[in-house]
Amino acid sequence: GRPGVKGIRVCGAHQTGKPRARYACLGWCIDYRAGTKMLTMPGDETLKRGEAEKLLPLLEASPVLRNLKGRTTARHVRLKDGSSLFLSSAQAPGQRASITVQDLFMDEEDLYQKAAGKGDPVTDFIERTRSYSFTRKIMRVSKPVGDARSSIWQAVTRDVDLTLAYRVVCPTCFAPQFMSPERVVCQKLIKDGQETEPSPAEI
């Protein structure tokens, strides 16, 4: 809710709670920030499943959000404060062509280019917030796909004011350590019942 924070970018592995964080922030914005919102996903099927299995249950489970939810149609939730929550996929540029949004929530953006086949869906979605350049909130959440050209990897390593990363406590010295590959040590590997030295690929 800090006025100076215009965006949050989350790059993480599988099964690390990214969707839960995204929906929690979306729910907060519905409650505290009147204005048009958009939730985006890579494909139409992913969007349909996310709406049925995550978004609508979230809106029903919370008494506050349930009271704010108005009429719901395909890919659109009308809120009782007069604003809207739109749902859009990277596969369908027509869904976002004429929509201006204040708060944007992007899910698995590294898959957008493959799903769309052409164009730059990530840039297209961000352009939808241009009219709210001083008040917008953009949350980009994705696991990295490919090499350093990954969209989310570039997002978290360029033009970022503050970077946060997980740290774990060393069982020997109890000092917190960043989980970078060069800090992970595998002493022995059990293979076919025998202890062996791990190869670089197995470390």
Role assignments for model-derived ranges:
Residues 1-203:
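Phosphate/NTP-binding elements of NTP-utilizing enzymes
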